[in-house]
Amino acid sequence: MHEVGPGDTVDVGVSVEAVPAWHDGRRRPGPGADELDALGYLVDGIWFAGDTDYDPAMEALRGRVDCALIPVWGWGPSLGPGHLDPAGAARVIDLIAPRIAVPIHWGTFLPLGLGRRHERLLTDPPLEFAAAVTGATEVTVVSPGGVVEL
């Protein structure tokens, strides 16, 4: 195990660079909770964004990312700061211009209290994301548990 912060790189058979993410860094709820830097990871041109929001500083990733694994939703009908919805995720992808983008963080969890009224949140976010990307990036939508060949 290696503790890392933004900008740190470790070699574990491949080079893993910790890159900033824009999300609440608390590790437990409530006042006095430990707060750490929220992170994403860049591994040989593949960027796992982690839980993040849009930030113009992401432009530093432009030209470094071949494949982006980008969150396009969360778990409910609205998302607060620190999260990307389909339009926000498309904005990030248009900013950094990877060759391929794979929408993640969707389709796996719908709290019981939301019921059938919000079932579209299990299926629509990656399609909305793909429609919102305006650049040349190829969007590959894969169902949860699926595989992407690079």
Locate the predicted segments by residue.
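Divalent metal-coordination and catalytic microenvironments
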Residues: 16, 51, 68, 101, ...
